[in-house]
Amino acid sequence: KFSKLEDINQLNFKPIFLDDGLIFFDKKGTIIRYNNNKKIVWKNNHYSKPEKKLKPKLNFSQKGETLIVTDNIAKYYSVNINTGELNWSKNNTYPFNSGIKIFEDKFFSIDYKNTLRCYNINDGSECWNLKTEDTFTIASSKFSLIIINDVLIFSNSIGDITAVDIETGLIVWQLPTQSSSIINETYNFKISKLVSDGNSIFFSNNKNEFYSIDVKTGTTNWINDINSNLTPIVTGNLIFTVSNDGYLHVIEKNKGNIVRINDLYLNYKEKKRKDIKPVGFSIDNSNLYLTNTDGKMII
């Protein structure tokens, strides 16, 4: 049983799924490994009493027997996945606000100051960092990063999309998607996670913009008018996304043409509709599953 996490609808933290169970955390930052029978294999907390009171929220990534952890109170550390024991622990200057990507002997994360940081997975030493333009307010959504070949591509709080060489940290290309005025407005700016088919990168925001950009050059393929900060799903030649007011959009991947729009909140009364927002969605061969801020799922 997990201790309660506040604002669960606003969280974007995922457990690590293993062949024989999963790993997650509670509100005090305790990491817990469960087996497939829901029994605790181990549980360990690597925080001091003052740190526990801050209710750290953890990001996980795994390589072999190593679990890499970053959090929103500026710690990052490595844990043995079999025992839960600490391999090493370090502190960053600022809290982290992204997931973690691992590439060979390095891992990457972005902090609240829009700085991409590259660390050595074996001892936590910093290999390099790349600062992008900062803002005066705290971002309201987590930053996203993906790795394609030997290039890491990431977003920041002002909507810049930046591609860097994994080994050197040098910028390959950068695409600003917002005007300079966004620097003062990031408290309500939200951007989706980046997704890619290997040739293009797709993402959207709550400023009514859905982008397709070229992986190699960062040039814009097309932009469409869709207001969404949910992670889009690419399947075949189609992109699926759900707007913040509950409309499913099906988009042709190469040209950006909208193939279909469906109102997923059609059965909600107008008053109720104003009070709910989509949280996330997934699709299979025949169904779409949409979770909402009211705790219900639409299929």
Q: Language-model segments: which ranges?
A:
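Beta-propeller domains
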Residues: S157-I158, T168, S196-N221, S228-N229
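Extracytoplasmic beta-rich repeat domains
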Residues: K1-D19, I40-G64, E85-E104, E126-N149, ...
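Redox- and metal-dependent alpha/beta enzyme cores, enriched for Fe-S-associated oxidoreductases
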Residues: N244-V250
